[in-house]
Amino acid sequence: MKQTLDYIDDNRVNVIYQIPLAEIVFDFFDKLKSSTRGYASFDYDMSEYRRSQLVKMDILLNGDKVDALSFIVHKEFAYERGKIIVEKLKKIIPRQQFEVPIQAAIGQKIVARSDIKALRKNVLAKCYGGDVSRKRKLLEKQKAGKKRMKAIGSVEVPQEAFLSVLSMDEDAKK
């Protein structure tokens, strides 16, 4: 919400806004610097606390909650932020031997989901031609092994994943 707009001289403007602190944390500084090519600066003061509808968003990797990726977001923007973060994490987290679901959840409700596909070895490479039942047996054996790995496997989260949660730029939507 804009409060004042003062022209200091021909090249400088002083604009005073009231913005929620959460919006400043999520990529405001980077957007300000990139849109002004580094010329703008900002200073902030805490004006007051206001009641708002906030929710805690948890990020689940392979069904396990990652506390370091949890954050508080306004209820109105929860779906969009969850979708952006899930897509970013899908690009950053390396593929595993098993399929890894990435979910954004508010309480028990899943608001966004994406899957990292599993790496697969071509088990049919040594089967030339013929027997369909042999091929099916090999694929079923691989499927059972992947299911077993998924049950006991854990996912390593790279360091840049934690930093990417804080930057909400538009390239995640592409």
From Swiss-Prot:
Catalytic activity: GTP + H2O = GDP + phosphate + H(+)
Recorded superkingdom: Bacteria
The keyword Transcription belongs to this UniProt entry's keyword annotation: no
Swiss-Prot/TrEMBL keywords: Cell membrane, GTP-binding, Hydrolase, Membrane, Nucleotide-binding, Protein biosynthesis
Intracellular or extracellular location(s): Cell membrane
GO biological process: positive regulation of translation; translation
Bilayer topology term: Peripheral membrane protein
EC number per UniProt: 3.6.5.n1
Entry's family note: Belongs to the GTP-binding elongation factor family. LepA subfamily.
Functional summary from the UniProt entry: Required for accurate and efficient protein synthesis under certain stress conditions. May act as a fidelity factor of the translation reaction, by catalyzing a one-codon backward translocation of tRNAs on improperly translocated ribosomes. Back-translocation proceeds from a post-translocation (POST) complex to a pre-translocation (PRE) complex, thus giving elongation factor G a second chance to translocate the tRNAs correctly. Binds to ribosomes in a GTP-dependent manner.
Protein name: Putative elongation factor 4
